[in-house]
Amino acid sequence: MVIWTDPAKADLHHIFEYITHDSHHYAKKVVQEIADKTGVLHELPHIGRPVPEIGDDSVRELSLYTYRIIYEISGRDIYILAVAHKRRDLKAQDITR
């Protein structure tokens, strides 16, 4: 099962709020595409690449537009940990696991 953590939900909300300043339609589209992209993870959990800043193969990422969708594989569950802009200087301590 794919489970969105509270920090990841907050990231998605902030992305929506930021984009909506320019286009409400595009903001909805981007957020929906991010959600859709995570939908395949329950069947293909290893589709993403390991996150180099974390150094743990169970923490992986998918890329969409300018965003990194960071998730952790834990048994049969997939936890969406964060959705971060690619330009962000991401550090291991920025990801709540």
Language model feature labels by segment:
Residues 15-18, 37-41:
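Short alpha-helical functional segments enriched in proximate histidine and acidic residues
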Residues 64, 72-97:
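Enriched for short, Lys/Arg-rich terminal
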